[in-house]
Amino acid sequence: MFPKYLILIFIYFIIIYCGEIKNLKDFLTDVIIDTHGDFKYILMEMVNKTNMNDYKYLIRGSNEFDYHKRLYFNFMQNSVYKFPDVYKNFNFKVLGGGRIAFKGKDIIVYGESGVYGKANHKLTCNLLKKQFPSFNVKDL
């Protein structure tokens, strides 16, 4: 998994050398989470403003944040607000939250957000299985 700052540098590089990006969802990482411990996460939907059938689900989670809302604000500040020309064709909506726990080779998805409600844990598990194929991912 790449450090967050490398992802931002990559996006900046794309902006400078490629101009406006029409299909951002193809290279925006589905899952950016810590890979240890027990932490809060949010499930978001990224939708193209001109084509509602063009969408992607994103998971963001970290030990750094005590509140689901701060995860969302961090994502917006470090991505959308930092590069408004790149993200101007997309809307981002939080679909819910919960917790992710790494326990050995198991990833456990559970809980809910007080602000955003419970995320679709089955969808979250499917995205995590793609990102971590050697782990046993389960929903409680």
Language model features by range: what are they?
Residues M1-L8:
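Classical eukaryotic N-terminal signal peptides for Sec-dependent ER targeting/secretion
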Residues Y5, I15-L140:
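Intrinsic low-complexity, intrinsically disordered or marginally ordered coil/linker segments
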